[in-house]
């Protein structure tokens, strides 16, 4: 994606033994109508056989600790409908109505206040 190699973008991976089982990409980007330093979670995926085991939760919590360290104020994402419950369980809140991302399906913007 555009911006993936920017100085203020970062990418995380969760390994089990030597197998990459979960990834997440973050990009410093302010959300419209939000103040402060924002980061967008631009993509996250976990191998199907490892879903529901807390791997994504651990990876995202690691990212949140890092974002506190770089003085980010909030993290936001365009969450797929099937992932709403996951993000809500981490403290994210809805900040938009449902919308369709062409070729992917229903989404809602969500955010988490970091500091």
Locate predicted features.
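Short loop/turn motifs at secondary-structure junctions and domain boundaries
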Residues: 2-7
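Conserved beta-strand in the GNAT
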Residues: 13, 19-29, 40-45
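A conserved beta-turn-beta hairpin within the catalytic core of GNAT-like acetyltransferases
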Residues: 29-41, 51, 104-107
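Conserved acetyl-CoA pyrophosphate-binding loop and the N-cap/start of the following alpha-helix
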Residues: 50, 54-62
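Conserved short alpha-helix immediately C-terminal to the canonical SAM/SAH-binding motif I
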Residues: 59, 83-86
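Conserved GNAT acetyl-CoA-binding A-motif
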Residues: 67-80
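Conserved catalytic-core motifs of GNAT/GCN5-like acyltransferases
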Residues: 76-78, 93-109
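Conserved active-site tyrosine of GNAT-family acetyltransferases
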Residues: 87, 92
């Amino acid at each position: 994606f555009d911006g993936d190699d920017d100085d203020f973008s970062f990418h995380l991976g969760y390994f089990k033994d030597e197998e990459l089982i979960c990834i997440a990409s973050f990009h410093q980007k302010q959300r419209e109508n939000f103040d402060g330093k924002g980061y967008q979670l631009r993509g996250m995926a976990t191998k199907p056989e490892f879903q529901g085991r807390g791997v994504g939760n651990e990876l995202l919590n690691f990212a949140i600790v890092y974002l506190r360290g770089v003085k980010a104020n909030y993290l936001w994402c365009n969450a797929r409908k099937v992932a709403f419950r996951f993000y809500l369980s981490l403290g994210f809140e809805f900040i938009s109505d449902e919308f369709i991302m062409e070729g992917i399906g229903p989404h809602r913007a969500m955010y988490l206040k970091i500091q």
